[in-house]
């Protein structure tokens, strides 16, 4: 693993769904399945909680985590044990303020990406008219390209926005491997950690506690 995350992480973090589903984290944990990874994470978060680190998620993120885990064979009891070590809180959406410049940039980005998406759709229509490719192949290609040009690297879900707003409200670091959420958080001056970096931070805290006790 790499070095310890910056000390500005503090005692509160807000996590998105990728904290619990990240493939790289699963690899670092040595988990062979999502079920095993969830069990290990529950134990790690329990230890983190005892050291004073609080992990928040929003209701929309919790629902997304549960859907994903249930759909991938994680037992409901395991999910409940994992969720026992996080706090669920919605952002106060009517009281928060965002910089006008950020909102303007976001609208400009959305418009530019929609234009690219339209060109991708037009290209695939022309390809369908002049080629003998299977319809399924063309549709698959269209979906992949359209998603790449219109969604990759930007806020593209309610869950992302909720996570960003809650972190802003709490003045907390964000834990995510999502590129779009990371960029938006950094625009607002928030600290961002990947799921693996959070694990490193927790392990570093444990080492500090041990050294103090000794």
Swiss-Prot record:
GO biological process: tRNA 5'-leader removal
tRNA processing among keywords: yes
Pfam family, one: PIN_5
Entries under InterPro entries matching the protein: PIN-like_dom_sf, RNA_free_RNase_P
GO molecular function, one term: ribonuclease P activity
EC number: 3.1.26.5
Keywords: Endonuclease, Hydrolase, Nuclease, tRNA processing
HAMAP family registered for this protein in UniProt: RNA_free_RNase_P
Job description of the protein: RNA-free RNase P that catalyzes the removal of the 5'-leader sequence from pre-tRNA to produce the mature 5'-terminus.
Entry's family note: Belongs to the HARP family.
Name the record gives this protein: RNA-free ribonuclease P
Protein's organism: Aeropyrum pernix (strain ATCC 700893 / DSM 11879 / JCM 9820 / NBRC 100138 / K1)
